[in-house]
């Protein structure tokens, strides 16, 4: 009886031991590469093991493929196990085909069957088809690594990880990333990079966790996805197959599994040995033979590009083209490049235009290391002789006087000259005399300006190496600096004379109202400048233009009108009403009378500029004369011939004028409308 009982106990013990051993065999497995694993795996479709490395390839970058690799034996979970549990760790790689977008991805699969003959590739990942997707009879759980955004499955992007239950519409998904334990935040990871990626899938206590990381990173502390799932509801018979599925469509890639570890228990899961994992092949782009047509098209494209670039070069060359001759080398320090002036004036922008006169337009600009400038574009008459023209421009730039607008240099291109001068911040005098939007100048300011211009003219006539005739003195050519000092500018018709030279003049130049009567017969001289300065004195004191056709005829000619006022013993009536009576009567009357002396139609009766300075500074008394004196108050040359041979004893006697034919220098700085 005792022996029978002992025999029964031993039988039960050996049966239980056999059961435990079989359970341990089914508890898990590990593949560090798949070189010896073919007998334990079920492969179908495009799936195969690449020898000798033992790399498991699911697809080979061909279109419309699917491949499956499952552990052959199902794992049975007995009914006494209240909850299913498992853990797996695998390393995969999705390698793009050179020159193609990859697709569609890899899925780790838990299924009640390994028969996927009815499944479709492409977005169905070789797991389902349009009929079975979402069907209650589909006993399937998949962790998808999806590299294509499928709108029909509401994919979030083309680089995401998702949990799929009976359908490719993920119940949980997130863009591929991993939690960095070092940085304490998620870091993105690209699935279709060709690099090995680690995936952990842990299911325990009805909680499914999916964790992702690059090969070089240990398992992160936090999973990417976490979802409560009851697998018993999905797999009521509790018999489960574990494996992988991958698919391509028109989008293709190489999809590999490098190593795989599986266990029923997370605590018993074996670690993969990365040193034993196979290498990932990276295909090189095929060097396709270039067709002759493509070569011709490329050559044609190159020729077109060269033509376009050549056109741009020629356009820019023409745009910035300048005329340079050998003789100009000696003047190079005074020459500016057209490109620098083009940029300085913001391409001669109209908003920067300061004025427009008879000789050209003036623009404001700014040059580095120079500052604010005024640039006048002058159309040059080639008949005048360019070499002499440039020489006189440069010589004009050498004139140094505090009451001259400094000429900084020039630029020459084709029939155009650009003259560069210092910018005068307060513009021209005529704006303050005739434009009501400008404030009226006080008498003291006007007198200072007249003295400044007289000083500048005296310098031009006697202070330079050569006599310089300005030939266009008027209010619009008198510039005002920041302190309202007068500066004589616009040498648009200026010319040089050697002392004692005498050459006939062939044409009269100047501005109507400022031109001396003898210009038509005797040409220019220093006395023609004195005449114009006399008109300027009347203009500044009266606040009127020398000729104004809009007013009654008896007041139309400024010189005659001032003389008429004097003749009526009311010369103060000619004074600018904008002064509001705030002026010295003695000074204003002196300036008006001096203006009449300077505008005497008998040139020899006009004072020199040196004498004008003495008079205007009241260092000398004015000559004794009256409105009826010969040549006084005559604004037209009608009486010129009858009085020219006479001599006025009431005005200083001046030596005979000389007139010369010289290059006229077109240097104009006009800030108002030229007249």
UniProtKB/Swiss-Prot annotation:
> Keywords in UniProt for this one?
ATP-binding, Cell membrane, Glycoprotein, Kinase, Lectin, Membrane, Nucleotide-binding, Receptor, Serine/threonine-protein kinase, Signal, Transferase, Transmembrane, Transmembrane helix
Record field: catalytic activity: L-seryl-[protein] + ATP = O-phospho-L-seryl-[protein] + ADP + H(+); L-threonyl-[protein] + ATP = O-phospho-L-threonyl-[protein] + ADP + H(+)
Write down any Gene Ontology CC term.
plasma membrane
Specify where the region named Legume-lectin like lies, as residue ranges: 27-263
Which terms does the record give in the GO molecular function aspect? ATP binding; carbohydrate binding; protein serine kinase activity; protein serine/threonine kinase activity
Give the main location: membrane
Extracellular side residue ranges read 23-292
* Glycosylated sites: 60, 129, 186, 209, 230
Q: Which InterPro entries does the record match to this protein?
A: ConA-like_dom_sf, Kinase-like_dom_sf, L-type_Lectin-RKs, Legume_lectin_dom, Prot_kinase_dom, Protein_kinase_ATP_BS, Ser/Thr_kinase_AS
Positions bound to ATP: 354-362, 376
The answer to keyword Lipoprotein applying to this record is no
Locate the active site.
472
Cytoplasmic compartment segments: 314-675
Q: How does it sit in the membrane?
A: Single-pass type I membrane protein
SUPFAM superfamilies reported for this sequence: Concanavalin A-like lectins/glucanases (SSF49899), Protein kinase-like (PK-like) (SSF56112)
Please give the CDD domains that the UniProt record associates with this protein: lectin_legume_LecRK_Arcelin_ConA (cd06899), STKc_IRAK (cd14066)
Output this protein's name.
Putative L-type lectin-domain containing receptor kinase I.11
Q: Name the enzyme group at the top EC level.
A: transferase
Superkingdom is Eukaryota
């Amino acid at each position: 009886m005792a022996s029978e009982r002992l025999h029964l106990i031993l039988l039960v013990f050996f049966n239980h031991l056999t059961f435990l051993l079989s359970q341990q065999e089914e508890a898990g497995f590990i593949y560090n590469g798949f070189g010896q694993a073919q007998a334990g795996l079920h492969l179908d479709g495009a799936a195969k093991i690449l020898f000798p490395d033992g790399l498991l390839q699911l697809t080979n970058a061909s279109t419309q493929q699917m491949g499956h690799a499952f552990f052959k034996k199902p794992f049975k979970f007995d009914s006494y196990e209240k909850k299913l549990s498992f853990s797996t760790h695998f390393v995969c790689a999705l390698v793009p085909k050179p020159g193609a977008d990859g697709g569609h991805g890899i899925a780790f699969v838990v299924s009640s069957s390994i028969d996927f003959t009815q499944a479709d590739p492409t977005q169905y990942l070789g797991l389902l088809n349009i009929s079975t997707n979402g069907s209650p009879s589909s006993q399937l759980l998949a962790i998808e690594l999806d590299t294509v955004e499928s709108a029909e499955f509401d994919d979030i992007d083309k680089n995401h990880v998702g949990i799929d239950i009976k359908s490719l519409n993920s119940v949980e998904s997130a863009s591929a990333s991993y939690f960095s334990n070092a940085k304490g935040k998620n870091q993105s990871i690209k699935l279709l990079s060709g690099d090995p990626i680690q995936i952990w899938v842990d299911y325990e206590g009805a909680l499914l966790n999916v964790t992702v990381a690059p090969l070089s990173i240990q398992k992160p502390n936090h999973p990417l996805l976490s979802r409560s799932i009851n697998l018993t509801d999905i797999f009521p018979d509790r018999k489960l197959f574990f494996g992988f599925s991958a698919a391509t469509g028109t989008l293709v890639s190489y999809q590999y599994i490098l190593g795989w570890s599986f266990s029923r228990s997370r605590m018993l899961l074996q670690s993969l040995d990365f040193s034993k994992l196979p290498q990932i092949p990276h295909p090189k782009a095929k060097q396709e033979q270039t067709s002759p047509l493509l070569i011709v098209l490329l050559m044609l494209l190159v020729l077109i590009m060269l033509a376009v670039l050549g056109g741009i070069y020629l356009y820019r060359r023409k745009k910035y083209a300048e005329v340079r001759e050998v003789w100009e080398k000696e003047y190079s320090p005074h020459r500016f490049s057209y490109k620098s002036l083009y940029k300085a004036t913001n391409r001669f922008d109209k908003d920067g235009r300061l004025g427009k006169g008879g000789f050209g337009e003036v623009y404001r600009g700014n040059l580095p290391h120079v500052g604010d400038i005024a640039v006048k574009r002058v159309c040059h008459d080639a008949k005048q002789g360019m070499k002499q023209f440039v020489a006189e421009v440069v010589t004009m730039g050498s004139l140094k006087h505090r009451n001259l607008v400094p000429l900084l240099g020039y630029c020459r291109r084709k029939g155009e000259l650009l003259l560069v001068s210092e910018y005068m911040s307060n513009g021209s005098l005529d704006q303050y005399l005739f434009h009501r939007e400008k404030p009226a100048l006080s008498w003291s300011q006007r007198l200072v300006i007249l003295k400044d211009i007289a000083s500048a003219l005296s310098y031009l006539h006697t202070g330079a190496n050569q006599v310089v005739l300005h030939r266009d003195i008027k209010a619009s050519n008198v510039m005002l600096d920041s302190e309202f000092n007068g500066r004589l500018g616009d040498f648009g018709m200026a010319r040089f004379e050697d002392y004692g030279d005498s050459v006939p003049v062939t044409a009269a130049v100047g501005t109507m109202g400022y031109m001396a009567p003898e210009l038509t017969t005797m040409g220019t001289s220093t006395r023609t400048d004195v005449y114009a300065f006399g008109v300027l004195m009347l203009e500044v004191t009266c606040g009127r233009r020398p000729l104004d056709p809009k007013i009654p005829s008896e007041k139309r000619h400024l010189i005659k009108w001032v003389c008429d006022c004097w003749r009526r013993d009311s010369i103060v009536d000619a004074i600018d009403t904008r002064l509001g009576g705030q002026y010295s009567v003695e000074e204003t009357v002196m300036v008006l009378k001096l203006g009449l002396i300077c505008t005497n139609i008998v040139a020899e009766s006009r004072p020199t500029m040196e004498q004008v300075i003495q008079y205007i500074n009241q260092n000398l008394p004015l000559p004794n004369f009256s409105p009826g004196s010969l040549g006084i108050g005559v604004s037209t040359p009608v009486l010129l011939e009858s009085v020219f041979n006479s001599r006025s004893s009431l005005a200083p006697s001046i030596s005979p004028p000389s007139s010369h034919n010289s290059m006229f220098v077109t240097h104009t700085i006009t800030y108002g409308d030229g007249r």
